[in-house]
A protein has these predicted regions:
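Polar, enzyme-active/binding microenvironments
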Residues: 1-328
């Protein structure tokens, strides 16, 4: 006797024996679920680095605990506005601007659960700054940015667990700088950027290579989205661009962003870190650089609340490095 097929209910949970991960069904697809994080004395750790004017300082904090940031160590050199990403154990800092208006091809890495100075990982194939990063447990991708040749549409990737030089991934739809990058385990999202003060959102499939595809549009944000993006495995958050606006999208589908809430004050080029439940937005220009930090709950919607303070006022640095962001 054959059994009639049954519709899978939204919210159903399964164990995928091929990937060794838990998954939840969200209406049209199965999405991986974060079910563990390294033991880091209270929860997942967020890391930010660099600053404008140029700095090599790395700071960290425990995302579930409202408190001030602490010194972690130093980058290999002073720089800001590069791309970054992480696995559960390693954080990568790619490219950047050493000032004035220089561009680097250096890639540094840290072991997130410890403290100490960054170590050489390898080099990008093309030096760049003012771009963004996307990552999952396996790969970290440097997206766009610019150098002396102008704005770039190239994407470059590395395998996080090894060391070595970056390889070509594909191209974005247009050459841009100042984008925001956010990731699920499957997809990387690229939002906003300039020139053209674009409000477009594009996506890539991290495990493959290829060109970015259209996802939808931001409602109000665009231009300087750099640093103001983060995600859980299900939802991406976009903030910054010198406004208080926070917007969100559901990563597995395509479509335009929706209103999420507001930050406590306007920020441009802030830092963002998440443990896939709480998102922390810190630093940025208000219009001068600030050391303030605020948090949101990604699974709901609402306005930012006070979190604590950075070691020093910081903007335009590296971010999206944590042990439990949406790509993990």
């Amino acid at each position: 006797m054959s059994l009639s097929p049954r519709e899978i209910p939204t919210g159903a949970v399964r164990y995928n024996t091929d990937t060794d991960r838990m998954e939840v069904y969200i209406g049209s697809t199965w999405m991986e679920v974060v079910v563990s994080t390294p033991n880091l004395n209270g929860g997942a750790r967020g890391v930010i680095a660099g600053n404008n004017p140029t700095s090599n300082v790395i700071q960290f904090f425990t995302i579930p605990i409202q408190a001030n940031a602490t010194d972690f160590g130093d980058l290999s050199q002073n720089r800001f506005v590069g791309g970054s990403g992480s696995s559960r154990t390693r954080g990568l800092f790619m490219g950047g601007d050493p000032g004035p208006s220089g561009r680097l091809d250096d890639i540094d890495f840290i072991t997130i659960s410890s403290t100490g100075d960054a170590t050489d990982f390898g080099d990008l194939s093309t030096a760049t700054a003012h771009g963004c990063g996307a990552s999952n447990q396996t790969r970290c991708i440097m997206i766009g940015g610019g150098n002396s040749s102008g704005s770039l549409n190239i994407m470059q990737f590395v395998t996080i667990s090894s060391t070595g030089n970056a390889q070509d991934f594909g191209d974005t739809a247009i050459a841009q700088e100042h984008q925001g990058g956010a990731s699920s385990p499957t997809r990387g999202l690229i939002a906003g950027g300039n020139p053209s003060t674009a409000n477009a959102i594009q996506f890539i499939t991290i495990s493959t290579t290829g060109n970015a595809q259209d996802f939808g549009d931001l409602q109000a944000l665009g231009d300087v989205m750099m640093g103001g993006a983060m995600a859980s495995p299900i939802r991406a958050i976009f903030a910054g661009n010198y406004t208080t606006t926070i917007e969100s999208v559901e990563i597995a589908s395509k479509g335009n962003s929706k209103d999420f809430g507001d930050m406590s004050s306007s920020r441009g080029c802030p830092h963002s870190n998440t443990d896939s439940i709480r998102g922390v937005i810190s630093g940025g220009y208000t219009p001068g650089s600030t050391n303030s930090m605020e948090y949101i709950t990604i699974t709901s919607s609402g306005n930012g609340l006070d979190f604590g303070d950075l070691v020093a006022a910081t903007a335009n640095g590296f971010d999206t490095v944590s042990t439990a962001h949406g790509g993990l």
